[in-house]
Amino acid sequence: MDKLQYELQGYLQIDRYRKQRFLYPLLFREYIYALAHDHGLNSSIFYEPTENLGYDNKFSSLIVKRLITRLHQQNHLITSVNYSRFVGPNRSFYSQTIPEGFAGIMEISFSMRLVSSLERIAKYQNLRSIHSIFPFLEDKLSHLSYVSDILIPYPIHLEILLQTLRTRIRDAPSLHLLRCFLHEHHNCNSPITPKKCISIENQRLFLFLYNSHVYECESILVFLRKQSSHLRSISFLAFLERTHFYGKIKHLVVAPRNDSQRTLPLWFFKEPLMHYVRYQGKSIMASRCTNLLMXKWKYYLVNFWQCHFHLWSQPSRIHINELSNHSFYFLGYLSGVRLTPWVIRSQMVENSFMIDTAIKRFDTIVPIFPLIGSLVKAKFCNVSGHPTSKSVWADLSDSDIIARFGWICRNLSHYHSGSSKKHSLCRIKYILRLSCARTLARKHKSTVRAICKRLGSKLLEEFLTEEQEIVSFIFRRTRLHSERIWYLDIIRINGLVPNS
């Protein structure tokens, strides 16, 4: 890995990142394909592990060498006409290997730039966690008025993705090879949608292309943020697939304007309390400004995307709501600002009296029905929420079946530890526990009662976590189900958590 990073530094010239010209020679390096196929790289901060994406675990070094030899023997640039002749009989393997190699090179180049920028932030490892955004929202949203729920539009043509990369990469052979691949495997006249465009074997490449597209769509927000403050936002230097995390900057200095800036709208520069977070294609923009000003932001973004990126975005994809009356769904949580009543006792010299007041409090709960819908899709229960057996796991050993169900249950509990109403998760645990018992009963052709009697406490212990035991010592039993806990080791959303 050190050898690869050393060579990449010579090719990419990180200090001149925007003028990358020498990516194509890396496609002739055998270890590039080995690293791209390696589980350690596939389970990086950008993507899910390979077992979740459905990648084949097989890797043939011999076929990779043949692929590199064919690349060397090409005396002319590959065109979309002879691309099918080039891949030859190993079409499936080459069609997966070439995009994996290209995506791996681009991932490493972006991640090297990411690490170099994040090293200037104290404790930047904590910012990698998805849960790190919720303490920020808890600190800021209680003082704001309106929130915009935004769905970032998809590009209507694959060439838009390539044009986005051309602004950062000037390596013509690499872009030409990528264009040939896209034209060969997809109909470029159809709109890009997650289900239609991203196949399992090429999901990694298209996720990278989509991430670069979203990053460019957010470029206008970078400009406006820098114009509103003298402080440089280091967080925007980071290229992350998850979220852009604002640091908690306490004092913002409004940028002074000279005579040449008088023609620019004032609200571009004099509203520092505009906060923006994103995960994948969904983003949240909150501010203390009026509803009219939020509507201006809405139509400005729609027109900007349509004119600059040729993205067809309808105003209905951006919902503006008042925080005190509406909740928004983000990262598997239903979040909002609630008025919590408080009774304060004031003691005077001789008299004491009670004061009834209400404070704004950021609240997060787990919507149970979307989560049950995910369990239905995964075939753990039916549409009514009744647990069913997982028939595809019936051939596994008893310990593997129990371990798989326990792992899912513990991960869901770990991810939703920030909910203020954890009692709703009891139903999810019940569904998974009974589904596990019915799967074992199906395997042994027995009944659920007999399985539970035979396994006893072993079946229950697998669904309990050490974290629950530790937390029970910290908080009282009455506060255990209402206390929100955010973990800083969650770097990707749980697969069963719906994100829309």
UniProtKB/Swiss-Prot annotation:
Gene Ontology biological process terms, A to Z: mRNA processing; RNA splicing; tRNA processing
Keywords: Chloroplast, mRNA processing, Plastid, RNA-binding, tRNA processing
Gene Ontology molecular-function annotations: RNA binding
Domain of life: Eukaryota
Main localization, broad class: plastid
Cellular compartment(s): Plastid, Chloroplast
GO CC entries: chloroplast
A Pfam family: MatK_N
Function description: Usually encoded in the trnK tRNA gene intron. Probably assists in splicing its own and other chloroplast group II introns.
Family to which the UniProt record says this protein belongs: Belongs to the intron maturase 2 family. MatK subfamily.
Protein name: Maturase K
Species of origin: Brasenia schreberi (Water shield)
Gene name as annotated: matK
